[in-house]
Swiss-Prot record:
PANTHER family: UPF0145 PROTEIN SCO3412, UPF0145 PROTEIN YBJQ. Pfam families: YbjQ_1. It comes from Clostridioides difficile (strain 630). Transmembrane segments: none annotated. InterPro entries: UPF0145_dom_sf, UPF0145_YbjQ-like. This is UPF0145 protein CD630_17110. Belongs to the UPF0145 family.
């Protein structure tokens, strides 16, 4: 599945627009790790526990968006975006969304 942030793909034409697709997940940090992160926040440095949580959340949200796109018959997602929001202390939602499309080779480029 091709996923791009642009609205067009060089050498391809959009033969069908299938609409909005999205995937999301909400993740919370383990209380013990949260205490460690609070201490790290005082002394400085990367909060690796949160970084890992957000990386996993992105992967899950994108995977769910791809499942949504495939269910609609898409072979690509254009105008892809990621958004995150805090839903409560220690928990965040990750949302992946874009436009599901069917792309085909643009043979008109070869004719020029």
């Amino acid at each position: 599945m091709l996923i791009v942030t642009t609205e067009k793909v060089e050498g391809k034409k959009i033969s069908k627009v299938l609409g909005l697709v999205r995937g999301s997940t909400i993740r919370a940090k383990h209380v013990g790790k949260d205490i460690g992160a609070s201490f790290k926040n005082l002394v400085g440095g990367e909060l690796t526990g949160y970084n890992e949580m957000l990386t996993e959340a992105r992967q899950i949200a994108i995977g769910r968006m791809v499942e949504d796109a495939e269910a609609k018959g898409a072979n690509a997602v254009i105008a892809f975006r990621l958004s995150s929001a805090s839903v409560m202390q220690g928990a965040a939602e990750m949302l992946a969304y874009g436009t599901a499309v069917v792309l085909e080779d643009d043979n008109s480029i070869l004719e020029k």
